[in-house]
């Protein structure tokens, strides 16, 4: 088991996890190693950006269903505090938080190059981390979902690793 920052938490909040993660390692007498920290992100890759955006950012699709449910559950369990995880900026008014906004800001989606670029941008916001955990959502379209995982494994991650100067362990 290891430490994972959730896919539904905005990147600016996830960036605050790294200093605490490293502090925890230090306090436990472990080497300070961000590569032991994992980030989960909702990701969808398609052969073209239009297909990916239509599938992953449609409020009535599987990603929309996921964000609708997680927002309802966190709002019920944590009240307005739960909405904070979805805010694009800390002072964003609660009434401006929406599923549409989450799909636009928390789902990495597009063609191969789009997704590579979005992952590298995420890395710049968050800082170094070990594994990127691809969070897929209900496979409403099985061939499209399978293709997304294939593109992620065979096209996206090799390009991300090359850009970061890392091997694909």
Per-region residue spans from a language model:
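Active-site-adjacent structural elements that line small-molecule/cofactor binding pockets in enzymes
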Residues: 1-169
């Amino acid at each position: 088991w290891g430490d994972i920052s959730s896919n539904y938490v905005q990147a600016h909040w996830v960036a605050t996890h790294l200093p605490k993660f490293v502090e925890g390692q230090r306090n436990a007498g472990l080497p300070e190693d961000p590569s032991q920290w994992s980030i989960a992100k909702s990701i969808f890759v398609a052969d073209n950006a239009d297909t990916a955006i239509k599938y992953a950012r449609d409020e009535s699709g599987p990603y929309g269903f996921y964000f609708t449910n997680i927002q309802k559950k966190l709002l019920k369990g944590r009240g307005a505090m739960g909405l904070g995880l979805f805010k694009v900026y800390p002072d964003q008014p609660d009434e401006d938080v929406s599923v549409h906004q989450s799909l636009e800001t928390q789902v990495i989606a597009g063609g191969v190059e789009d997704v590579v670029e979005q992952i590298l941008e995420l890395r710049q916001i968050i800082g170094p981390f070990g594994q990127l955990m691809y969070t897929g959502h209900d496979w409403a379209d099985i061939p499209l979902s399978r293709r997304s995982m294939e593109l992620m494994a065979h096209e996206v991650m090799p390009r991300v690793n090359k850009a970061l100067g890392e091997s694909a362990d």
